[in-house]
């Protein structure tokens, strides 16, 4: 299913993002002077299952999760430098059941162990001065996308 996700908004997914699902987030532009840009994968109960915070000013990408009214867990960080290539950066997230696999522009994968074992029902996109276009497209499907009709 294809969604158009505008900055400072979220989309409710038609079907849960669950194990064996893939979400491909694609931007039509890259703002090299952009600031902190965040994508959150949210459960139906609004728990943040996967928090991806891209912070170019700190040269870091942070991964985390938290219960709706809980505290953030320990941050997991990787360097930001050279993760995105203009003009059309992308982020791909694969749910493997016990962990998420995250790829930036089809580069090396990062693995984030799930701390909250729920399915995502929505994806949120937040920024004041986004690195990416508004909207971004979000394509959510199974590991093998359905074949077109014959």
From Swiss-Prot:
Primary location recorded for the protein, binned into one broad class: secreted
GO CC annotations, alphabetized: endomembrane system; extracellular region; membrane
A Gene Ontology molecular function term of the record: carbohydrate binding
UniProt keyword annotations, A-Z: Cell wall, Extracellular matrix, Fruiting body, Lectin, Membrane, Secreted
Places the protein is found: Secreted, Extracellular space, Extracellular matrix; Secreted, Cell wall; Endomembrane system
Pfam families membership: Gal-bind_lectin (PF00337)
Annotated signal sequence range: none
Function: Binds lactose. May play a role in fruiting body formation. Displays toxicity towards the nematode C.elegans by binding to a specific Gal-beta-1,4-Fuc-alpha-1,6 modification of N-glycan cores on C.elegans intestinal cells.
Annotated binding of a carbohydrate, by residue: 51, 55, 64, 75, 77
Protein name per UniProt: Galectin-2
Complex formation: Homotetramer. Oligomerization is required for carbohydrate binding.
């Amino acid at each position: 299913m294809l969604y158009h996700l505008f900055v400072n908004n979220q989309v409710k997914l038609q079907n849960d993002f669950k194990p064996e699902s893939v979400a491909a987030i694609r931007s039509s532009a890259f703002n090299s002077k952009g600031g902190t840009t965040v994508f959150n994968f949210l459960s139906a109960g609004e728990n943040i299952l996967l928090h991806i915070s891209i912070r170019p000013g700190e040269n870091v990408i942070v991964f985390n999760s938290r219960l709706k009214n809980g505290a953030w867990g320990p941050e997991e960080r990787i360097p930001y430098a050279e993760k995105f290539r203009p003009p059309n950066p992308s982020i791909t997230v694969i749910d493997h059941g016990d962990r998420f696999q995250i790829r930036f522009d089809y580069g090396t994968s990062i693995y984030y162990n799930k701390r909250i074992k729920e399915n995502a029902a929505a994806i949120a996109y937040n920024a004041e001065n986004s690195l990416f276009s508004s909207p971004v497209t979000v394509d959510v499907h199974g590991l093998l996308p359905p074949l077109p009709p014959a």
